């Protein structure tokens, strides 16, 4: 049996649960991440005017006191994800350090889709390890 922490994914309008993401607690369990339900709806944490696109749920939660975290569960931005990005004043992209090139490609794709408020923030360490003050400094100083 596998122990997992589960993050619920809700519909942005009805707030009904449409999916979930399970993260294995034991690093030897595979798959590390498992998605249930609608795999095209991103996980969102926070209610701020600015948002940051991240790879995973813990990173989205880590920024939620400062920005809205939007986890796309990897590095591929799907067409449906874009519709979830419309309400935000500024959009930041913070993918893991090994995906910096993909972050810049994602920004280019979003700009070609009509988003003009895109800022890529390359990371030294994974956002899930940042505290609220570190997040605030990273994005607003």
Provide a role label for each language-model segment.
Residues 48-51, 57-141:
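TOPRIM fold recognition
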Residues 1-90:
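Phosphate-handling DNA/RNA-contact segment within nucleic-acid enzymes
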């Amino acid at each position: 049996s596998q122990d997992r922490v589960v993050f619920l994914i809700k519909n942005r309008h009805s707030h009904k649960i449409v999916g979930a993401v399970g993260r294995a607690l034991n690093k030897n369990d595979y798959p590390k991440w498992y998605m249930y339900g609608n795999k095209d709806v991103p996980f969102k944490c926070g209610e701020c005017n600015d948002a940051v696109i991240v790879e995973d749920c813990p990173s989205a939660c880590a920024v939620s006191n400062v920005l809205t975290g939007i986890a796309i569960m990897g590095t591929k931005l799907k067409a449906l994800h874009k519709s979830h990005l419309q309400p935000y004043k500024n959009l930041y992209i913070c993918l893991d350090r090994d995906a910096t090139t993909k972050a810049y490609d994602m920004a280019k794709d979003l700009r070609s889709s009509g988003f003009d408020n895109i800022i890529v923030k390359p990371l030294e360490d994974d956002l899930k390890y940042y505290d609220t003050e570190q997040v605030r400094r990273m994005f607003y100083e």
